[in-house]
Amino acid sequence: MKILYAASEATPFAKSGGLADVAGSLPKALVKDGVDARVIMPLYGDLKYREDLEYVTNYSVPVGWRSQYCGLFKAEVNGVTYYFLDNEYYFKRRGLYGFYDDGERFAFFSRAVLETLFYIDFTPDIINCNDWQTALVPVYLNLYYRHLDKFNRIKTIFTIHNIAYQGKYGTDILEDTCGIGRRDQHIVEYDGCANFMKGAFETADKITTVSPTYAQEILDPWFSYGLDALLREKQYKPVSYTHLRAHETLRHL
């Protein structure tokens, strides 16, 4: 079993909230259980232990109508391989989020996660994406990579840590920045906006949450932050990490 855990933050390298704790602990637990679990995340400007990273290679990543540089670094901590995606324009800043171009930054990161698989000796059975920052990974996988032999058997899990943050932007971002043509924009559009998380709901093979309580909470209109209609429409039944076993999950995908 091979799992690539895509996250915008992970301990011990970068943290702004609980996502980093899960991204730092779950892959480690899976490795102890015999799973080849690896983590991929941005190489932020204030990333801890930057001096210990090993340079691997660099390549170009499509971002809308243009291409952007991506450097690949790696490190191993507690038996887990971490990959770091470098682009100084997007990530060499103080802090992780809250910038005017966050949509472009994480559209780049989501596309770069998939492009990276061409340059490493690792093809995951599952890509586990987390929150809106990686929500375009399953969208891009289905639109642009699924026909390739390396990608056609990869399954995706999307984990909701905080449904309040969905990656909502004007629809003009979709073609120019995200590279999603008009024919496919309905996948990511919701309620007059581009909504990255909605795109993951439409394209991921399985949806999980971080606890049984939260899995039930987000089915309530009061706690769904506008996504309750979509959840009802898709008869959405999220499962929690408490109930998630990697081997069982792959068997049912």
Locate predicted features.
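Conserved small/polar residues in nucleotide/adenosyl-binding loops
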Residues: T242-H252
